[in-house]
């Protein structure tokens, strides 16, 4: 029971850490050194082809509880998260419905950066059972590699997304050290991890509004704690940013969307 509960909460918390955060408005970010081209790296049809290929294979992996194929279509946080989710599904016989990724698209935000890695932020529609939209982050690490799904974030109720250029125009990628904002993207991720770890005792608590992710994590923690106490077990959670696991896209108004 103890190991089983730990596995479930590990999968849930990993999913939560893939949340997107908007950079605060302020001065325009300092331009980064990488080059920008006039056209986006993918057309809308190419984005659809990439997304459809990956999600079709992922659906097959979900149905077969197949973790061996995942590295061919996933990388980074999403590879770790989906592997954990499928391992939990193998043990419980049930795959959480929140792992569903809608196939319909609301908006594609396509990078115009000429170098690598390149990113595409795809915002889906809601699911058939009216779950929230998903933000999908696809990355291509080099010219000789296919795009892979790097991150998935559930866009909780009340989330306000920044405005982006249309897919025909494309958007510039940001960097973890972008300046001209209230804080750099890396500092924003560090601050949010501190909020998750320390809650009301975080030094950033007074500067941050409540959000659904932290509320849901608090509820989940309380539920798991009750189960642990019934079985004379203990639980411990640690939240810290993974070095390099960050993706940034510039919004139309000069802010950053950070995942």
Regions found by a protein language model. Name each.
Residues 22-25, 153, 246:
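Compositionally biased, intrinsically disordered low-complexity regions
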Residues 2-21, 25-132:
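An N-terminus-focused feature that recognizes amino-terminal "leader" regions
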Residues 38-90, 164-235:
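Core segments of small alpha/beta cavity-forming domains
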Residues 2, 31, 128-190, 253-259:
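Short beta-strand edge/turn micro-motifs at domain boundaries
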């Amino acid at each position: 029971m103890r190991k089983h509960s730990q596995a479930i909460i590990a999968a849930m918390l990993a999913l939560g850490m893939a949340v997107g955060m908007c950079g605060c408005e302020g001065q325009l970010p300092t331009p980064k050194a990488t080059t920008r081209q006039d056209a986006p790296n993918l057309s809308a049809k190419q984005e659809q082809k990439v997304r459809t290929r990956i999600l079709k294979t992922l659906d097959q992996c979900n149905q077969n509880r197949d973790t061996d194929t995942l590295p061919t279509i996933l990388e980074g946080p999403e590879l770790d998260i989906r592997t954990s989710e499928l391992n939990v599904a193998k043990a419980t016989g049930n795959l959480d419905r929140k792992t569903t990724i809608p196939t319909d698209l609301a908006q594609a935000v396509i990078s115009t950066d000429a170098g690598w890695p390149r990113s595409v932020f795809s915002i889906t529609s809601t699911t058939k059972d009216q779950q929230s939209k998903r933000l999908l982050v696809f990355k291509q690490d080099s010219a000789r590699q296919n795009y892979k799904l790097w991150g998935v974030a559930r866009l909780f109720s009340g989330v306000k997304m920044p405005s982006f250029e249309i897919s025909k125009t494309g958007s510039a990628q940001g960097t973890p050290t972008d300046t001209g904002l209230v804080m750099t993207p890396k500092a924003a991720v560090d601050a949010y991890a501190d909020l998750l770890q320390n809650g009301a005792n975080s030094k950033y608590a007074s500067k941050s509004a409540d959000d659904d992710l932290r509320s849901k994590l608090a509820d989940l923690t309380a539920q798991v704690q009750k189960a642990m106490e019934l079985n004379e077990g203990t639980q411990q959670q640690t939240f810290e940013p993974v070095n390099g696991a960050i993706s940034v896209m510039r919004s139309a108004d000069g802010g950053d969307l950070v995942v």
